[in-house]
């Protein structure tokens, strides 16, 4: 399990207590973190080159004679089980890989502010989506074996300067169908598609807009329980939870509000349990109930606030081994409960080795 916060990254090798950060090289906060599936890099070799020209030198004969920087900083991924990435404040998007829960170097393959970062969950098509601010520069790094991952080989999904969405923009990935959904502001979500065959690195990819959601999207997630259609869930800044069925089909979409009556504030996270009927929703405001759960697809909602202090909650994860074990990332670090099914769960801090910092994102390795 990987936890990103104002103080950098902490990790848990067992899904339990967080390890002490003995190597404090990250000074910038991680806005987002992402973990590759366990067996994604079991076979084949992938080399990711860094972005920073100061780590390389200019070669006038590279890129077919056009000249380019030859980078010295690179990460080799070959048989690694622990591969993770994240978007950092002012420090681009990094990638790390190791096999022994030990110290590994972070390699910045982006630049500027790193934002939404998402690994493919399809082991047969390896890539990581990364973003600069707004929707100005959404890109995909092809991690399939044998690919060139220098700067020229990265795939451009969007390239504009109209500042669509938020500065650090919310997004989600349907890696079954190859669609990136990103907040586009004003009640809209932009969907980028027709790119995951990696046929043209430099062309801006096709996109369409899902409109009529009423307010800015502050949380998005795709239910990854089937691969024929795309069901998108969108939480908004005015406290609504939308379900968009057939989100991949511009002519056959259906949108419905499945919010609870007690939803007040801005939605910060949407996660799923064992199936699409189990949905977890959190809010990042003070003075409101921050954690809700449904087991019937949104027909009935229960507050799971319990004894949690009045603090913003930014993200939530359920243990895949015990449905009663749930953790949340908050303004004051990570909190956990072992009795989530109770009407009033008992929450306690789980910050061993990590300070009382804002936890901006959490991700759990699949597969």
Give the predicted meaning of each segment.
Residues 1-367:
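Beta-propeller blade termini and top-face loops
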């Amino acid at each position: 399990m990987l936890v990103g916060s104002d103080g950098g990254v902490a990790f848990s090798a067992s899904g339990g207590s967080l390890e002490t950060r003995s190597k404090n090289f990250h000074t910038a906060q991680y806005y987002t973190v992402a973990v590759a599936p366990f067996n994604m890099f079991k076979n084949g070799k992938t080399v990711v080159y860094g972005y920073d020209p100061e780590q390389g030198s200019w070669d006038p004969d590279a890129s077919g004679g056009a000249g380019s920087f030859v980078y010295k900083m690179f990460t080799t991924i070959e048989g690694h089980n622990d591969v993770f990435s994240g978007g950092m404040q002012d420090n681009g998007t990094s990638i790390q890989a190791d096999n022994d829960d030990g110290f590994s170097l972070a390699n910045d393959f982006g630049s500027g502010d790193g934002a939404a970062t998402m690994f493919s969950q399809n082991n047969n098509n390896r890539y990581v989506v990364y973003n600069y601010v707004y929707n100005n520069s959404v890109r995909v790094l092809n991690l399939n074996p044998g690919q060139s991952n220098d700067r020229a080989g990265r795939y451009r999904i969007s390239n504009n300067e109209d500042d669509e969405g938020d500065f650090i923009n919310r997004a989600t990935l349907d890696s079954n169908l190859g669609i990136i959904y990103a907040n586009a502001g004003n009640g809209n979500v932009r969907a980028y598609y027709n790119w995951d065959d990696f046929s043209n690195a430099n062309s801006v990819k096709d996109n369409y807009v899902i409109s009529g959601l009423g307010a800015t999207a502050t949380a998005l997630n795709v239910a990854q329980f089937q691969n024929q259609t795309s069901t998108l869930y969108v939480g908004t800044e005015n406290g609504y939870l939308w379900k968009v069925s057939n989100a991949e089909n511009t002519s056959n979409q259906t949108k419905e509000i499945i919010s609870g009556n007690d939803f007040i504030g801005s939605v910060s996270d949407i996660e799923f349990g064992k199936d699409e009927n189990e949905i977890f929703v959190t809010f990042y405001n003070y003075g409101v109930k921050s954690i809700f759960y449904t087991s019937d697809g949104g027909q009935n909602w229960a507050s799971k606030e319990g004894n949690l202090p009045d603090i913003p909650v930014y993200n939530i994860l359920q243990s895949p081994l015990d449905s009663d074990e749930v953790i949340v990332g908050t303004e004051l670090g990570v909190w956990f409960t072992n009795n989530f099914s109770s009407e009033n769960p008992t929450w306690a801090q789980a910050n061993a080795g990590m300070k009382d910092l804002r936890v901006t994102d959490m991700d759990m390795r699949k597969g």
